[in-house]
Swiss-Prot record:
GO molecular function ontology, one term from the record: peptidoglycan lytic transglycosylase activity
Residue numbers spanned by region Disordered: 465-485
Gene name linked to the record: mltF
Pfam families: SBP_bac_3, SLT
Keyword Membrane: yes
Cited function: Murein-degrading enzyme that degrades murein glycan strands and insoluble, high-molecular weight murein sacculi, with the concomitant formation of a 1,6-anhydromuramoyl product. Lytic transglycosylases (LTs) play an integral role in the metabolism of the peptidoglycan (PG) sacculus. Their lytic action creates space within the PG sacculus to allow for its expansion as well as for the insertion of various structures such as secretion systems and flagella.
Protein name stated in the entry: Membrane-bound lytic murein transglycosylase F
UniProt keyword terms in alphabetical order: Cell outer membrane, Cell wall biogenesis/degradation, Lyase, Membrane, Signal
Example of a GO biological process term: peptidoglycan catabolic process
Known catalytic reactions: Exolytic cleavage of the (1->4)-beta-glycosidic linkage between N-acetylmuramic acid (MurNAc) and N-acetylglucosamine (GlcNAc) residues in peptidoglycan, from either the reducing or the non-reducing ends of the peptidoglycan chains, with concomitant formation of a 1,6-anhydrobond in the MurNAc residue
Length: 485
């Protein structure tokens, strides 16, 4: 009897202890997603490798999505850790893994098929889905014209969803979804005639058009849509709420607009002929002078590709060019500037590049200290073209209009006014062809973007061997030189 009583007491104590342990365990709340990120000190993000999202150059990681999410990580006070997915299915699946990324920032458009997997953030970029065809082939003018065409799109994309809906209306419509390609590959396949059509978003086309000057927009397929970030559907609201607050703030404080201007504000300046010509000169002319650009860029501590872009804008990498106004050489130096920079022969490409590099950095160093990068570079380019005095006049006009005189996005709006009497009569330095520096900067930014992309470490071997696909090179020249749009 006594033994049974003792046993019951021991069991009761054990049950009580177990119950207390379970009760205490239940009282310890699981940290939220946001708390985990802050405790770890790392924001793990998955994206796509493309010019419009994320890629690496000699200076490190870059891209629209990368910069936007880097600002978010900075706001959280944590480090950013990026991984890339080979395809959209892999990207979405990674969000559901316990040790995987907590955020997808990859130019995503909300998709019905993904709603059980993820939840989407507030929008940050408006894009238009576009049907792309090759110049010289019949142009489809509407959805019915897609029937009978060889079409390929990214597997699991919103474009695949659109085609699936159209197939209900046009049962004969056929298309292929591929997880072995990226947008760049699809555009190349259209450019080379491997497929008839593809669907891409307008921002992706804008970033890649110059590499594939044969591609054209047939028509917009549907209304504009919003790009968003995504988090796993199973996560709590903490991180998504923080993301939405950040994106709303970025919209209001100008962060988003500055990034849009940096990555998309200059992408349509080349046109078809410019894209084709630049593609040729990239392989035929640049190699002759690349060592000089690199050498003097190192001396002046400037990116050699920026110097090369300036040289292309000035002379198309032709060392013996002379303008009607007397500027000469690869970097198109005036006699006065050449003398000041120690250049004795403006037609010597080595001396011209040396003088141009030195002059550009001199201008940049003389700018007001309140002008920060990347705007400082764009201001220096404008001053290189139009002169520092006229640039200051434009900054003064910007102040009067309650715009930011230290932001290129604002000052470039004022420069064209220097050609209008009602405005230039109010300035210190008077009339200037103010529209020219705006185009000058836009062109150089575009050339620089292309040079940055094609000189990625993983592509340099192909460039050196002449195997890199650059549109218009190693192919028959397209017959039509009309505008791409």
């Amino acid at each position: 009897m006594f033994a049974h009583t003792a046993l019951r007491q021991r069991c009761a104590k054990w049950l009580l202890a177990t119950g207390l342990f379970l009760l205490l365990g239940a009282c310890v709340e699981k940290p939220s997603t946001l708390e985990r990120v802050k405790e770890d000190g790392v924001l793990r993000v998955i994206t796509r490798n493309s010019p419009a999202t994320y890629f690496q150059d000699r200076n490190g990681e870059t891209g629209f999505e990368y910069e936007l999410v880097q600002h978010f990580a900075d706001d959280l006070g944590v480090k950013l850790q990026i991984e890339t997915a080979d395809n959209l299915d892999e990207l979405y699946d990674a969000l559901g893994k316990p040790s995987g990324p907590v955020l997808a920032a990859a130019g995503l458009v909300s998709s019905e098929r993904r709603k059980t997997q993820v939840r989407y953030s507030h929008p940050y970029l408006e894009v238009t889905p576009q049907v792309i065809y090759r110049n010289g082939r019949p142009r489809p003018t509407g959805a019915k014209g897609l029937v009978g065409k060889k079409i390929m799109v990214l597997k699991g994309s919103s474009h695949a969803d659109q085609l699936a809906e159209l197939k209900k209306q046009y049962p004969a419509l056929q298309y292929e979804e591929s997880d072995a390609v990226e947008v760049v590959d699809l555009l190349r396949m259209v450019d080379e005639g491997q497929i008839d059509l593809t669907l891409v978003d307008s921002n992706e086309l804008a970033m890649n058009q110059v590499y594939f000057p044969n591609v054209r927009v047939a028509f917009d397929l549907g209304e504009t849509r919003d790009q968003r970030w995504a988090v796993a559907a199973g996560e709590d609201n903490s991180l998504l709420n923080e993301i939405n607050e950040y994106l709303d703030k970025a919209q209001k404080n100008g962060t988003l607009q500055r990034l849009k201007d940096r990555y998309y504000g200059h992408v349509d300046v080349l046109g078809y002929v410019g894209a084709y010509t630049f593609a040729q000169h990239l392989q035929q002319r640049l190699p002759k002078y690349e060592k000089h650009f690199k050498s003097y860029a190192k001396v002046e501590q400037v990116d050699w590709r920026l110097l090369a872009a300036i040289g292309y804008q000035e002379s198309m990498w032709q060392p013996e060019v002379t303008s009607k106004t007397g500027v000469r050489g690869l970097m198109m130096l005036t006699q006065r500037t050449a003398q000041a920079m120690g250049v004795s022969n403006r037609l010597d490409p080595r001396q011209s590049i040396q003088g141009g590099a030195k002059y550009f950095m001199k201008i940049k160093e003389e700018l007001d200290d309140s002008i920060k990068e990347p705007d400082r570079t764009w201001f220096a380019l404008a001053a290189y073209n139009v002169g520092g005095g006229h640039l200051e006049d434009a900054r003064t006009l910007a102040k009067r209009e309650k715009l930011n005189p230290n932001k290129w996005l604002d000052v470039k709006k004022m420069l064209p006014r220097l050609a209008q009497k009602q405005w230039y009569r109010q300035t210190k330095y008077g009339y200037a062809r103010g529209g020219e520096p705006v185009h000058f900067v836009a062109n150089i930014r575009r050339y620089y973007d292309i040079l940055t992309w094609v000189t990625q470490p993983q592509l340099e071997g192909q460039v050196a061997e002449g195997n890199l696909h650059v549109p218009g090179v190693n192919k028959d020249k397209p017959a039509d030189k009309s505008s791409p749009m």
